[in-house]
């Protein structure tokens, strides 16, 4: 009897525990159904239809009947503002198709545009395509005789020098009826030249002509292109208005062949050359950098030694202090010409307190066979301690006009052995 009572009590306790466990499982599943995101009460019917179809498709994949919510939680996708809904047959709604990559109607033109400014995408913004101002046709210096535009190209294979004569502007002509022409020389050959057509009754002639010089590749970098602009009067006599000297160097012939070059006309020096020739150069002093700059431009009327085989002519520039040698630089050599053109720049370090004791010596030398050099002429510029006359005036003008290039001609004096 006692054993039967014990079995009965144990069965009752086991049944209660089983009932409690089943109740807990049902409670957890019942609570899980309320953890999903709740949709708003006033929803768009199209939105409800959209999610109903979404739910039906989910049931098909998960195997859960439509009348029962799946046990796997899901997240409601965000609503897309601004989408258009179109009605379908049967009372359903669908989203109208849209471009997956919508293009903005307007976009800012530039970073500096105002908040209200906008331009259509695909349109050209002219501010982005503005070319830099061409300053070649403005800024004519005082006393300018005119300006000439031209182009130079050298064809290595055919050894031809192509020169394009483009135009001239601001020519200073003696009369209103201006008729101009241009003669082209390839120095040092002064005898042969090419000539442009005469432009009548115009002070800003447009030539647009091409000329060809046959010159070897070995000597082209030693040549100088000379443009002489003439006024033709009623008697057909030629009056020189100005000239341009353009050295043909390696850096000039390299690069873009269609680059347009312009130069201001220079007056021809009518003074006869001195006994040993003349040299033209510029001086400039920068007191802030303590830098003395020398630009060797050209020489003329050099007395070459005919009894020797001439190879080339160059200029040696020496900086002296208290008549003691400090530093020396030299130009490139020009094939034996009595009128060589250099256009080369040199700089020397000179303190301000040394300007009263420093001087510059420029010597023109002729190189012969065997690399022997013979002086052709010499000039010294500096303070009163070393020079007089034009050489002293040139030095003084350089000091009065700091950071400016002061250009002058100087007569070469008797050479001394270097």
Curated annotation (Swiss-Prot):
<keyword id="KW-0677">Repeat</keyword>
<keyword id="KW-0812">Transmembrane</keyword>
<feature type="topological domain" description="Extracellular">
    <location>
        <begin position="1"/>
        <end position="4"/>
    </location>
</feature>
<dbReference type="Pfam" id="PF00168">
    <property type="entry name" value="C2"/>
</dbReference>
<comment type="subunit">
    <text>Homodimer.</text>
</comment>
<protein>
    <recommendedName>
        <fullName>Synaptotagmin-15</fullName>
    </recommendedName>
</protein>
<keyword id="KW-1133">Transmembrane helix</keyword>
<comment type="function">
    <text>May be involved in the trafficking and exocytosis of secretory vesicles in non-neuronal tissues.</text>
</comment>
<dbReference type="InterPro" id="IPR000008">
    <property type="entry name" value="C2_dom"/>
</dbReference>
<feature type="transmembrane region" description="Helical; Signal-anchor for type III membrane protein">
    <location>
        <begin position="5"/>
        <end position="27"/>
    </location>
</feature>
<keyword id="KW-0735">Signal-anchor</keyword>
<comment type="similarity">
    <text>Belongs to the synaptotagmin family.</text>
</comment>
<dbReference type="GO" id="GO:0016020">
    <property type="term" value="C:membrane"/>
</dbReference>
<keyword id="KW-0472">Membrane</keyword>
<dbReference type="InterPro" id="IPR047897">
    <property type="entry name" value="Synaptotagmin-15/17_C2A"/>
</dbReference>
<feature type="topological domain" description="Cytoplasmic">
    <location>
        <begin position="28"/>
        <end position="418"/>
    </location>
</feature>
<feature type="domain" description="C2 2">
    <location>
        <begin position="275"/>
        <end position="396"/>
    </location>
</feature>
<feature type="domain" description="C2 1">
    <location>
        <begin position="144"/>
        <end position="261"/>
    </location>
</feature>
<dbReference type="InterPro" id="IPR035892">
    <property type="entry name" value="C2_domain_sf"/>
</dbReference>
């Amino acid at each position: 009897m006692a054993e039967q009572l014990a079995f009965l009590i144990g069965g009752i306790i086991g049944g209660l525990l089983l009932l409690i466990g089943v109740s807990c499982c049902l409670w957890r599943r019942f609570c899980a159904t309320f953890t999903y995101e709740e949709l708003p009460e006033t929803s768009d019917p199209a939105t409800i239809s959209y999610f109903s179809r979404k739910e039906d498709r989910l049931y098909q994949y998960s195997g859960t009947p439509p009348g029962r919510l799946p046990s796997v939680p899901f997240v409601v996708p965000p609503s897309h503002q601004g989408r258009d809904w179109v009605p379908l047959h049967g009372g359903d709604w669908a989203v109208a198709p849209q471009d997956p990559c919508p293009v903005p109607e307007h976009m800012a033109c530039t970073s500096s545009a105002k908040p209200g400014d906008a331009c259509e995408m695909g349109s050209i913004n002219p501010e982005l395509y503005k070319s830099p101002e061409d300053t070649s046709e403005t800024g004519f210096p005082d006393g300018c005789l005119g300006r000439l535009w031209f182009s130079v190209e050298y064809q290595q294979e055919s050894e031809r020098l192509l020169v394009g004569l483009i135009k001239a502007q601001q020519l200073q002509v003696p009369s209103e009826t201006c008729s101009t022409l241009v003669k082209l020389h390839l120095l040092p050959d002064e005898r042969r030249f090419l000539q442009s057509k005469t432009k009548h009754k115009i002070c800003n002639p447009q030539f647009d002509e091409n000329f060809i010089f046959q010159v070897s590749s070995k000597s082209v970098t030693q040549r100088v292109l000379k443009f002489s602009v003439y006024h033709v009067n009623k008697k057909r006599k030629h009056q020189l208005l100005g000239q341009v000297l353009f050295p043909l160097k390696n850096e000039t012939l390299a690069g873009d062949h269609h680059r347009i070059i312009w130069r201001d006309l220079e007056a021809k020096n009518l003074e006869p050359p001195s006994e040993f020739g003349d040299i033209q150069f510029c001086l400039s002093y920068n007191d802030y950098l303590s830098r003395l700059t020398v630009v060797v431009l050209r020489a003329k009327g050099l007395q070459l030694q005919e009894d020797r085989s001439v190879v080339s002519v160059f200029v040696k520039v020496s900086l002296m202090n208290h008549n003691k040698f400090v530093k020396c630089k030299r130009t490139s050599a020009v094939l034996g010409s009595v009128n060589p053109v250099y256009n080369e720049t040199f700089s020397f370090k000179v303190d301000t307190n040394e300007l009263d004791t420093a001087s510059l010596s420029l010597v023109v030398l002729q190189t012969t066979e065997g690399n022997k050099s013979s002086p052709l002429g010499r000039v010294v510029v500096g303070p009163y301690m070393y020079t007089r006359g034009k050489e002293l005036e040139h030095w003084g003008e350089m000091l009065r006009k700091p950071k400016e290039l002061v250009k002058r001609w100087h007569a070469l004096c008797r050479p001394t052995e270097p």
